[in-house]
Amino acid sequence: MSPSKWLLTYERAVKKATKVKLAAPKYKHVEIILEATTEDPETLENVIQALCERLKEQSWTIVFKTLIVFHVMLKEGAPNTTIVALSQRPRILEVLKASSLLAQGKNIYNYSRFLSERAKQYGRLGVDYAQVGDAPKKKIREMKLENGLLRNVEGIQAQLRRLIKCQFVAEEIDNDIAITAFRLLVGDLLVLFKAVNIGVINVLEHYFEMGHHDAAQSLRIYKTFVNQTEDIINYLSTARSLEFVTKFPVPNIKHAPISLTASLEEYLNDPDFEENRKQYLQNKSGSPVEETAILNRKPTLRKKKSIPKKQNESSSTIQKENTVQQEASSSEEEAVKSLPETQRTTSRIETQEEEIKEEEMEGEEEEEEEEVPNYESENELEDKVGDLSLSLGVASSFVDEMLRERNNLSAEGTSASPSLDKKSESTNIVQPIPSHPNDSLNPFYNSSSPTYHPQPIPPQLQQVQLLSQMAGNQMANIQYTMNGMQQTGASPNTALNISQVNMYAQNNPVNPSTTNPFQNFLRQPSYQGMQFEQQQPTTIPLQPNIPVLNQQYPVMIPAMEDSRGPLPSPAHIMYPEGSPGFIQHSPNGFTHGHSASPVNIGQKLDVPERPMSTPYTASKNPFSTRELAEPTDLARNSISTESKNPFRS
């Protein structure tokens, strides 16, 4: 492609990127302009010249978008290309006619001054500290005082001074152009502030090495840093409040200490400034006074070297003691040789016995040392067993709470829950087992057990537990009785089977069946002062439900009269023996809370047969005001053929 065509594409991209439209420059046009930064300097110069022509327009949108394109070229273009070209003539970025722009005029002016200052400081320092990367920060961190440390820090502060003045008001950031410019400025602010932090720390490290003039300049730099830090914090707080608009996360910044101004001024204004500086340099580099002191410390080193001599002396004394012991032992042997043979043998025997005792003592000590680990292992085993039992106790308590909440049982009426390893320790009480094995709430219940063998129960314990269950578990779905297998009518030597359970078997009158839906409506009698006897169970084959009672049970039937006389009292009704009922006969004649006469078994009553045509004795008309006639009159009127019209005379 010829250069003319290249120029045409770049000029077209510049015009498209800086249109009058109130919108941010499209990246597809900016991308073409960024390609010019990788071309030869002439192409880049032509693009810059075309952008400068757009800065002379009267529309603030065109001018603002042109500055944004310049900023993007400095940030995302080829490094050290656009900044080099602008540093040669930095004033071309300044918008002189910004005051004539009614809208966004102040923001455009400050924005252009910042870009111009950035290009100017690059031409002065040779480093673009606003460029993203670690190279500029590394350079200022390792820079020394004689290499222009103070000058570089002042250049960074000059850029920050111009940037802080670009304070966009929140009401002015109401369009995409201002939002894009503000986002780019916040990014440069964070990069420059990081660079100035590193530079100020480096200045403070060399502060006490400087002369009076450099120290005064460093103090001015530090004061400027303190003031700019406060302004930067306010600027970033505004940016943090506009994160939802700019979509640029603002981090929490850390800066150098800003409370050293007084101490630095005190050091600078000290009349002994030069003496303090020389002393600091001597302490840092090392003075000849210290070298002579180090040479004079040789006797101390000799004293340390004389320590092995003491060790040699101690070793020589030990050798002397050994020689003395050897001489003493040799003298004893000579004395023993001079003794007669009998005394020699006795002395040898004594020495042998002493040696044997010493060996036994040493053996016992070794055994004790070997047994210590065994004791430790036993302690560890006990700890492990204790931990295991604790965990089992926690598990059993959890099961207790689960059963208590599910069955709504009281603490007195429930027994200890089964553990994982041990069975129930009770020998006189049979654990309650539901009539259906699948409905068991016990998680450790073995449903595969073939038989059930109840154990003998003392009558007092049986009745007390029955009463506690009646008081605490009236609405339970499972019959928690002490002799549940026999009360439900199943054989004690057969496995639990639904087909073998008699659902119509007789129950204990003291403990009404918990499956009775009307049991909550029955008033519970007072059991104080009464003695209960053990109930002997009876097994009855499966029979249909016959609503006939074969025991004493309160039946309240109101007295009624018929046309032929009063009806007989229910106390004289004779029920056949052996008929199955819902409540078992109690031998003590216990009544269930009513004052009516009980039903006596064995008494006969002649019940007259009533005709089916007996009229009803009460009128069902709610609007009838006429008094009811006697039953005899009703029967007579039902047979008569007279008219029943009430309006007929």
UniProtKB/Swiss-Prot annotation:
This is ENTH domain-containing protein C19F8.03c. InterPro entries: ANTH_dom, ANTH_dom_sf, AP180-like, ENTH, ENTH_VHS. Keywords: Cytoplasm, Phosphoprotein. The keyword Phosphoprotein applies. Transmembrane segments: none annotated. It comes from the Eukaryota. Residues 299-308 have a biased composition (Basic residues). Residues 352-381 have a biased composition (Acidic residues). The modification Phosphoserine is found at S285, S287, S417. CDD domains: ANTH_N_YAP180. Residues 313-326, 340-349, 409-418, 614-624, 635-649 have a biased composition (Polar residues). The modification Phosphothreonine is found at T414.
